[in-house]
Amino acid sequence: MAELTTIARPYAKAAFDFAIEHNAVDNWAEMLTFAALVSENETMQPLLNGALANTKLAALFINVCGEQINKQGQNLIKVMAENGRLSVLPTVSKLFSDFRNEWAKEVEANVVSATELSLEQQQHISVSLEKRLARKVKLNCSTDTALIAGAIIQVGDLVIDGSVRGKLSRLSDTLQS
């Protein structure tokens, strides 16, 4: 994973810098997300890892993407194909999204709760995180009944485990030591 990130970072940074310069950050985010989906397609995977000539691969990839990718996006695809890097497009898209969120002072928070959260609870969590992190927060909520009760909130490297399962696990660790 670290190697993919190292390979993808220069492409993501170049795309992000270009998008900032041309006031097209959201457009580039959409293009890269779409291109990443195309590259992850099971039909496309063998071609990305196969012996197809890089120029033909770039042309095929651009043809598949159609009008979803503009001229500058096509140029990025061509450069990545020439360097044999189209397979890292999902990582490029993720890094671009990270750069965008940092630039816009936004973060994504993954909230896993034992039961579905009401809109009021989601808003309370969002407001609390915004105060703590000094950033705009976008919640991604899901449920996991194995938590028993409570929730686990993850924002980047920060993990807040307020679940009963987590508390029981910590109690068990304490008793065993």
From Swiss-Prot:
It is a peripheral membrane protein. Its main location: membrane. One of its GO terms (cellular component) is proton-transporting ATP synthase complex. The keyword Membrane applies. Keywords: ATP synthesis, Cell inner membrane, Cell membrane, CF(1), Hydrogen ion transport, Ion transport, Membrane, Transport. It is found in: Cell inner membrane. InterPro entries: ATP_synth_OSCP/delta_N_sf (IPR026015), ATPase_OSCP/d_CS (IPR020781), ATPase_OSCP/dsu (IPR000711). One of its GO terms (molecular function) is proton-transporting ATP synthase activity, rotational mechanism. The keyword Cell inner membrane applies. It comes from the Bacteria. Pfam families: OSCP. F-type ATPases have 2 components, F(1) - the catalytic core - and F(0) - the membrane proton channel. F(1) has five subunits: alpha(3), beta(3), gamma(1), delta(1), epsilon(1). F(0) has three main subunits: a(1), b(2) and c(10-14). The alpha and beta chains form an alternating ring which encloses part of the gamma chain. F(1) is attached to F(0) by a central stalk formed by the gamma and epsilon chains, while a peripheral stalk is formed by the delta and b chains. F(1)F(0) ATP synthase produces ATP from ADP in the presence of a proton or sodium gradient. F-type ATPases consist of two structural domains, F(1) containing the extramembraneous catalytic core and F(0) containing the membrane proton channel, linked together by a central stalk and a peripheral stalk. During catalysis, ATP synthesis in the catalytic domain of F(1) is coupled via a rotary mechanism of the central stalk subunits to proton translocation. This protein is part of the stalk that links CF(0) to CF(1). It either transmits conformational changes from CF(0) to CF(1) or is implicated in proton conduction. Belongs to the ATPase delta chain family. This is ATP synthase subunit delta. It comes from Shewanella sp. (strain W3-18-1). The gene is atpH.
